[in-house]
Curated annotation (Swiss-Prot):
Cited function: Allows the formation of correctly charged Gln-tRNA(Gln) through the transamidation of misacylated Glu-tRNA(Gln) in organisms which lack glutaminyl-tRNA synthetase. The reaction takes place in the presence of glutamine and ATP through an activated gamma-phospho-Glu-tRNA(Gln). The GatDE system is specific for glutamate and does not act on aspartate.
Coiled-coil region(s): none
Listed SUPFAM superfamilies: GAD domain-like, GatB/YqeY motif, Glutamine synthetase/guanido kinase
Source organism (scientific name): Thermococcus kodakarensis (strain ATCC BAA-918 / JCM 12380 / KOD1)
Name under which the protein is recorded: Glutamyl-tRNA(Gln) amidotransferase subunit E
Gene Ontology molecular function: any one: aminoacyl-tRNA ligase activity
InterPro entries hit by this protein: Asn/Gln-tRNA_amidoTrfase_suB/E, Asn/Gln-tRNA_Trfase_suB/E_cat, Asn/Gln_amidotransferase, Asn/Gln_tRNA_amidoTrase-B-like, GAD-like_sf, GAD_dom, GatB_C_1, GatB_Yqey_C_2
GO cellular component: cytoplasm
Catalytic activity: L-glutamyl-tRNA(Gln) + L-glutamine + ATP + H2O = L-glutaminyl-tRNA(Gln) + L-glutamate + ADP + phosphate + H(+)
Domain of life from the UniProt record: Archaea
Length: 629
């Protein structure tokens, strides 16, 4: 595939940050690391930023505090305790989680530290009850080799996950604290990635190392991949929440495109001679112009006592509407910033539209005294809210004159990104005083290093040799993290080829029809147990899994009985075959064994999932031979 850009020429730099939940107990309390929708109690908090040990306040924390939100926490007695309500000092850390993190460090060619020191990272969006996240470096100076060159892994960290969000309101956020404290491994790379595909290769290698431990959680939300992307002349932008490995190259490509277009806008603004100080914080009340407007949004705001305010953006005409990513413009970036106060903005490059007439646009131009190259942005809301929203627009416009702002952005499903918050500063770390430092004896580190698990690629090779299964099946088993379940099934006596086929082919085929993520390992084990006990045929798996995906509260046995998928006795099978034979006796007399395919098809239509195919074939063959002589 041809590259859209010359990344070397553009000076592309990418760094990865990968977080993965560990499947152990919680990090600082011996409670299960599970999620539940059962709520036993609630409590509330308000959080405030504090200075770091250098006497500085983190800008991202300060911006979150300014929103003035109250945080409500839902808890479950089984899955939390006073540690995670911030009413009791932490215990631990969990030794198993620490050992898994050290294994991962070794697999990434990193050197374990001699002492583990936990730090506090300020987080006041409410996702941590205490207002900080505990994190510790466990290994340093790792590396991943790629065809483009080596990429450094400066740190492997062990930290605690945050609460999960239930509902976000304007002045209130509801969190569930069951996820809080689940151990996370955080792996950071150096910005030595210079091609989008290289980023994917590195992410896959790290993912393989994580999966090798067989101690990482699976499923939605258990892995989070963040990217740090910049080009020469642009800025470092952190992109959060990249869910799929295959999306990494596209997201990087789109961010390069965005930064290039923002630099072009900057150059055009410079050519037009505009400076940041030319954009004044002056609000024009243009409500009168829109008293009889056809715009429902504006009319609704005026009716509820709001105002229509405008700001002047000198020399910005034609640039606010300029596309910077497919379907997104500079105006979209301004709207994203304003969204903490209002639902949307109107700007000159998209008008007349949305019920706003050319007459109204011209009236605003006249009132603001705009020149041919000047632009305006409108907001309709309560006066102070409108002013706050327009202040965000002004701030973003000033940044556009400078080029690309440093910020944290959210990955969108289409590969684009959206503004989240300013880039966090370094002024948000300070020592954790409740957890003593942990000395790692050399003999303990050597024991862990000597007993490292096999990497996924090594496992694939072993499956091909040991179990004689197709390489593509082996690769899918490992990549889809079904390998541990596969080995358990084989150990129980299931033929490797059958176990692999059901786990890969059948489940993959059902993905288009039903939510297969609802099918648990427990469901699968139970279905195979029924098969091993001779209670279902292998043809029944598809039907059972389909029903379990739609109704995960059921058991495999329940589904088999409800759907009539339990195996018939040989006598019952023979009786049904006799009926099929009698219905087609003339064809058999005429064709003899040539009727085998037709009779087999009709018999299996009645017996599929209720009788073993080999038994049916044997009985059909025997009976046709008897008739044909």
């Amino acid at each position: 595939m041809t590259d859209k850009f010359n990344y070397e020429e553009l000076g592309l730099k990418v760094g990865l940050e990968i977080h993965r939940q560990l499947d152990t107990k919680k990090l600082f309390s011996p409670v299960p690391s599970e999620l539940s929708d059962e709520v036993d109690f609630t409590f509330e908090r308000r959080l405030r930023p504090t200075m770091s040990e250098l006497g500085e306040i983190d800008p991202a924390a300060l911006e979150e505090f300014k929103k003035g939100r109250k945080y409500i926490y839902e808890g479950n007695y089984r899955l939390t305790d006073l540690v995670y309500m911030d009413e009791e000092p932490p215990r631990g850390p969990d030794r198993e989680a620490l050992e898994v993190a050290l294994q991962i460090g070794y697999l990434l060619n990193a050197k374990p530290v001699d002492e583990v020191h936990f730090m506090r990272k300020i987080v006041i969006d409410g996702s941590n009850v205490s207002g900080f996240q505990r994190t510790a470096i466990v290994a340093v100076n790792g590396k991943v080799d790629t065809p483009w060159g080596s990429v450094g892994i400066p740190t492997v960290c062990l930290e605690e996950d945050a609460c999960r969000i239930v509902e976000r309101k304007e002045k209130e956020v509801i969190y569930r604290i069951d996820r809080l404290g689940i151990p996370l491994v955080e792996i950071s790379t150096t910005p030595d990635i210079h091609h989008p595909e290289q980023a994917k290769v590195v992410a896959k290698y790290i993912g393989d190392a994580l999966r090798a431990t067989r101690k990482v959680k699976r499923g939605l939300g258990t892995i989070r991949q963040d990217l740090n992307v910049s080009i020469r002349g642009g800025a470092r932008v952190e992109i959060k929440g990249v869910q799929e490995l295959d999306m990494i190259p596209l997201i990087i490509e789109r961010e390069v495109e965005r930064q290039l277009n923002l630099l072009r806008i900057r150059d055009e603004l410079k050519r037009r001679g505009v400076k940041p100080e030319d954009i004044k914080e002056e609000f024009y009340d243009v409500t009168e112009i829109f008293q009889n407007t056809g715009s429902k949004i504006i009319a609704r705001a005026i009716k509820s006592g709001g105002k229509v305010l405008a700001v002047k953006l000198p020399k910005f005409r034609g640039l606010i509407g300029k596309e910077i990513q497919p379907g997104r413009r500079l105006g979209t970036e301004m709207a994203d910033r304003a969204k903490k106060y209002v639902r949307g903005i109107f700007h000159i490059d998209e008008l007349p539209n949305y019920g706003i007439t050319e007459l109204e646009v011209n009236a605003v131009i006249e009132k603001l005294g705009l020149g041919e190259e000047d632009a305006f942005v409108l907001v309709a809301a309560e006066e102070e809210t409108a002013k706050n929203a327009l202040r965000e627009v002004i701030k973003r416009a000033r940044e556009a004159i400078e080029g690309v702002p440093e910020e944290t952005r959210r990955a969108l499903p289409d590969g684009n990104t959206q503004y989240m918050r300013p880039l966090p500063g370094k002024a948000r770390m300070y020592p954790e005083t409740d957890i003593p430092s942990i000395f790692l004896p050399p003999e303990e580190k050597e024991r862990i290093r000597a007993n490292l698990p096999e990497l996924p690629q090594e496992r694939v090779e072993r499956y091909v040799k040991e179990y004689k299964i197709d390489r593509s099946l082996a690769e899918t088993l490992v990549n889809d993290e079904r390998d541990e379940l596969f080995e358990e099934l084989v150990e129980k006596g299931v033929k490797p080829s059958l176990a692999a086929s059901i786990l890969v082919v059948v489940l993959k085929g059902l993905k288009k029809e039903v939510p297969v993520e609802n099918i648990t390992d427990g469901h699968i084990m139970e279905a195979f147990q029924l098969y091993l006990e001779g209670k279902i045929a292998k043809e029944a798996f598809e039907e059972i899994f389909k029903e379990l995906a739609l109704h995960p509260e059921k058991t495999a046995k329940q589904v088999a009985e409800e759907k009539g998928l339990t195996l018939l006795s040989e006598e019952e099978v023979e009786k049904i075959i006799d009926e099929v034979i009698q219905q087609n006796i003339e064809v058999i007399k005429a064709k003899g064994m040539g009727a085998m395919g037709m009779i087999m098809g009709r018999a299996m239509a009645k017996l599929r999932g209720r009788a073993d195919g080999k038994l049916v074939s044997s009985l059909v063959r025997k009976k046709i031979q008897e008739i044909a002589g």
